[in-house]
Amino acid sequence: MDGFGSSQAPAAYREVEWIADVFVIGMGIGWIINYVGMVYGSLKGRTYGMAIMPLCCNIAWEIVYGLIYPSKTLYEQGVFLSGLTINLGVIYTAIKFGPKEWTHAPLVMHNLPLIFMLGILGFLTGHLALAAEIGPALAYNWGAAFCQLLLSVGGLCQLISRGSTRGASYTLWLSRFLGSFSVVISAWLRYKYWPQAFSWLGKPLILWCLFAWLVVDGSYGVCFYYVKRYERRIGHDSDRKTV
């Protein structure tokens, strides 16, 4: 599966291919920082940071394009496998500490391992079906866009429904945002300099996905700021009452 490079690339793209490669590495760095930070924050706060369904979708995508349809580019393959490995730690912390976040829903609280197993299996078959329908190279990109939207919406909903920043931080938000934004830059370079293969990146649905992601992830930063400020105010008021 060719994700970001191919022997068929025109000369115009080959001149800027190294820039696209740098942003692919930037994507990997951003997401690895995010995953490691998520595991660390989960262990420290005894909670989990990524919403359940986005986590299942994300790890299923990494399995498909890290193991089943691996990239022909070594560094890209390394990014995916590194992310997959660390993501297993994210799932571990979610299963270990998730029950206390779901005391209001016993069915979820007592069945998190089963929910994760079924969720990953469901998204895994979905990604494979998409690859069979439109080909692995296209499905790789469309699947990534879906994962990103689901992750952004899930993260925002989790922050709002919890009314708390536990399991989250500015570092996690920014590393996720910068990692995903690196993908946007590399995709733009392919669209600009390799239109024969990537002109579809300028289609309305892709542009809508990009706009929706920017709005949702931008909103996450704003909501995080206000939730954090509320937590500080409540903590300050509590401190004054105990004096």
UniProtKB/Swiss-Prot annotation:
Induction: The onset of expression occurs at 48-hour-old stationary cultures and the steady-state levels correlates with the onset of aflatrem biosynthesis at 108 hours. Expression is regulated by nsdC.
Keywords: Lyase, Membrane, Transmembrane, Transmembrane helix
EC number(s) per entry: 4.2.3.-
GO function term, MF aspect, one: lyase activity
One Pfam family recorded for the sequence: Pyr4-TMTC
Subcellular location: Membrane
Membrane topology designation: Multi-pass membrane protein
Entry GO CC: membrane
Record has Cell cycle as a keyword: no
Coarse class of the protein's main subcellular location: membrane
Disulfide linkage: none
Source organism superkingdom: Eukaryota
Transmembrane regions listed in the UniProt entry: 19-39, 48-68, 78-98, 112-132, 134-154, 169-189, 205-225
UniProt family annotation: Belongs to the paxB family.
Functional description taken from the UniProt entry: Terpene cyclase; part of the ATM2 gene cluster that mediates the biosynthesis of aflatrem, a tremorgenic mycotoxin with acute neurotoxic effects. Synthesis of geranylgeranyl diphosphate (GGPP) by AtmG (a GGPP synthase) precedes condensation of GGPP with indole 3-glycerol phosphate, followed by epoxidation and cyclization by AtmM (a FAD-dependent monooxygenase) and AtmC (a prenyltransferase) to produce paspaline. AtmB is also essential for paspaline production, but its exact role has not been identified yet.
Identification of the protein by name: Terpene cyclase atmB
Biological source species: Aspergillus flavus
